[in-house]
Design a protein with these regions (language model features):
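Active-site hotspot residues in diverse enzymes, especially metal/ion-binding acidic/histidine motifs
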Residues: 1-144
Length: 144
């Protein structure tokens, strides 16, 4: 499933900024002038996989919902960023498994993170967790 299908499914329009955006993009839940679900704005100077990673991350803010416990604004921001990153990694790991023709030996966090130019330091644990879930879900398709 590509990011446009996800956006269509959640009813959030994608707006591309003509200038670079710090952080690559933002989900604006209160941008009601674009629809009931708000809007997603992404850095229009990005292309290809860079844009896809930003859009998937921002979709994660909408899809994973909000935290019910009382947190300070900085704590809540950290939680929301982690949820959005997990969503992005999960979707790209599913794509990666298809890309490597379900070859189990190549479905490693190191290769995945290198392929998408993501920080091993920041994303290794999360990628490992998500990839284990995906491998388990697709175990009947894996080639050893």
């Amino acid at each position: 499933m590509d990011y446009q299908e996800i956006l269509d499914g959640i009813g959030v329009p994608l707006l591309l900024s003509p200038v670079p955006l710090e952080g690559g993009g933002y989900y604006l839940p209160d941008a009601f002038e674009y629809g009931e679900e708000g809007a997603l704005i992404a850095d229009g100077t990005l292309c290809g996989e860079g844009l896809e990673l930003v859009v998937l991350h921002e979709c994660g803010h909408k899809i994973t919902g909000c935290t019910l416990s009382k947190l300070s604004a900085p704590q809540l921001h950290i939680v929301n960023e982690a949820k959005a990153n997990r969503f992005m990694i999960s979707r790209k790991a599913e794509d990666y498994l298809v890309e490597i023709d379900y070859m189990a030996n190549y479905f490693t966090p190191e290769r995945f993170l290198q392929r998408f130019k993501l920080s091993v330091e920041l994303f290794y644990d999360m990628a490992e967790q998500e990839m284990k879930k995906i491998a388990k879900k697709n175990k009947h398709l894996l080639v050893y």
